[in-house]
Amino acid sequence: MGGGERYNIPVSHPERPLPKKNHQLGRAKQRVVRDQNGVTTVASSGAAGGPHQHGHRKGAAYPWFPEARLAASAEKKNTSVRFANAYDQNWEGAVSHLNTLLAAQCGGPSYAGAKFSEPPSPSVLPKPPSHWVPMGTRDSREMMAFQLKSLLKVHA
């Protein structure tokens, strides 16, 4: 079975396009925004600028955050801005604490792994399974002959 069929439905268009202020396509969405000082404001978006603006208006990328406005104006002037607040100080303290913690755990010089200059002693190595251990020398020659014959499929 196929999907839904599409039909070309004629739509009447006005002779002149309507001005944007009269061309509202839906209700404005409202949200409550709190800034750093705890002041609550109601921000609306949607109908006035059209439903598909997504912050493309000039100068309205971050309208409610003063730090963002400061950074945007500094970006226009090609200057760098560093926000000095309690978060930066806490971050620097956490990084220095992490560095001291790692240095204490590693014990000074970094551990690079085992040295491969000399092989380990046989007492440290694991023992092989018993069926891997070769049998006595008395019938090893017969066993090898049998294995060779079976491999070469030669019957004597």
Swiss-Prot record:
Q: Using the chain's own numbering, where are the disulfide bonds?
A: none
Q: Which InterPro entries match?
A: PNRC-like_rgn, PNRC1/2
Organism annotation: Salmo salar (Atlantic salmon)
- Residues of the region (Disordered) are 1-32
This protein is called Proline-rich nuclear receptor coactivator 2
Keyword annotations = Activator, Cytoplasm, Nonsense-mediated mRNA decay, Nucleus, Transcription, Transcription regulation
- Give the main localization category: nucleus
Stated role? Involved in nonsense-mediated mRNA decay (NMD) by acting as a bridge between the mRNA decapping complex and the NMD machinery. May act by targeting the NMD machinery to the P-body and recruiting the decapping machinery to aberrant mRNAs. Required for upf1/rent1 localization to the P-body. Also acts as a nuclear receptor coactivator.
Per the record, GO CC terms?
A: nucleus; P-body
Question: Hey, which family's this protein in?
Answer: Belongs to the PNRC family. PNRC2 subfamily.
What is its subcellular localisation? Nucleus; Cytoplasm, P-body
- What domain of life does the UniProt record list for this protein's source? Eukaryota
